[in-house]
Amino acid sequence: MLPRSAGRDTTGLLFAREVAIPAMSVAAIVGSADIRIPIGLPGHRALIWLSLLVAVALVTRRRDTVIAVGAACTAATVMLHAGPSPSVRYLAAAAMLYAVAGAPAVQRRPWLVVIAAAPIHLVAMADPVAAVIRGGHLAGILSVGMGEKLQWHLVFGLAAGLLGWGLARGIGRLPRFGEVGKE
């Protein structure tokens, strides 16, 4: 996603960015899929899965790596769990990150991915909204509490974007927040 200088990447760091980070992200996302932390705030689990997808989108040389990670997470969680509904969020979010990362403005200013993570996290709302519609309660979408869920998903999406940025920055891949990437 970002321009690279020819001499900065060593073989070990390149391997870590292109193979180890995506593989560890898949393992962490799939491993955390069953963890339920009852803190009562909808969308808090994005701090794990979306932040890792954001980090993968920012650190790898090939943008399509994030789609591979999302697809692997979706496939693994579908195999481990009963249905595909909640698992599709990983692939959907990865596809959106892929699209956002390809925008010329984002390639020059990669910190924009942080902001984009907030609305991208709304893919996690697809399953609850579909359940309300399947139940024949279309008015339930606008019910009390749905607006609050949307707001929390946006908040945790932004927080996941910031956390993903921090992870990518910790790997040493990104300019400081607000700096413009070189072309």
Question: For each predicted feature, which ranges?
Answer:
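Cytoplasmic membrane-interface segments at the C-terminal ends of transmembrane helices
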Residues: L2-F15, A55-R61, Y98-L112, L162-E183
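Hydrophobic transmembrane alpha-helices
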Residues: L2-V59, D64
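Juxtamembrane/transmembrane-helix boundary motifs in multi-pass membrane proteins
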Residues: D9, L13-R17, L41, R61, ...
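Hydrophobic alpha-helical transmembrane segments
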Residues: V19-M24, S51, R63-A71, S87-A92, ...
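Hydrophobic residues within the alpha-helical transmembrane core of Major Facilitator Superfamily
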Residues: A27, A75-A76, M96, A118, ...
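Interfacial aromatic-anchored transmembrane helix boundaries in multi-pass membrane proteins
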Residues: S32-G43, C73-G102, V132-G135
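Juxtamembrane membrane-interface segments at transmembrane alpha-helix termini
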Residues: A55-D64, M79-P86, V100-R109, M125-A131
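Membrane-embedded alpha-helical hairpins and interfacial helices in multi-pass inner-membrane proteins
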Residues: Q107-E183
